[in-house]
Amino acid sequence: MEFSVGGVEVVLMRGDITEVEADAIVNAANSYLEHGGGVAGAIVRKGGQVIQEESREWVRKHGPVPVGDVAVTSAGRLKAKYVIHAVGPRCGVEPIEKLAEAVKNALLKAEELGLVSIALPAISTGIFGCPYDAAAEQMATAIREVAPALRSIRRILVVLYGEEAYQKFLEVFKKHLPGGRL
């Protein structure tokens, strides 16, 4: 399903984010950038240990990434140029609004890097425990608010692993984003 927001194409799709062609892939990360399981583990397995090594170096230099913020590394063997590590909230621990903040910061970082396309997973829905619909609301809100200000980013892919995630996100995005078409 495709949407258009402020001249930016937003594509909701099922799939494996490590296989997507985009200038940047967003990783659902923890503050210490230790990429063990879920999307983070898959990104390191597919992209190579260099992503984990660069992440540890980033934390050594800058300290842990605050919830709602991002860090950037190379993408190793992935098709992307960069991995933008976005730290979303743990539901029930940190405010859900930090998820929208993380998405906005990921989009703005990609814009700062002059990128054209970015792929986002369902941040905070894995071990961080946020329900798909709540995460989708935060992500749709962030995209709707930031997209009109983007100049280099022309395409945002929201890549969902599994049918349940896709259906929940589709339901929410249809409500919050204009111009949905198959």
From Swiss-Prot:
**Cleavable signal peptide:** none
Q: Which residues form the Macro domain?
A: 1-177
Segments spanning the bilayer are none
Q: Which Gene3D superfamilies match?
A: Leucine Aminopeptidase, subunit E, domain 1
Pfam families under this entry? Macro
Q: Which PANTHER family match?
A: GANGLIOSIDE INDUCED DIFFERENTIATION ASSOCIATED PROTEIN 2-RELATED, MACRO DOMAIN-CONTAINING PROTEIN
Protein name from the UniProt record: Uncharacterized protein PAE1111
Give the source species: Pyrobaculum aerophilum (strain ATCC 51768 / DSM 7523 / JCM 9630 / CIP 104966 / NBRC 100827 / IM2)
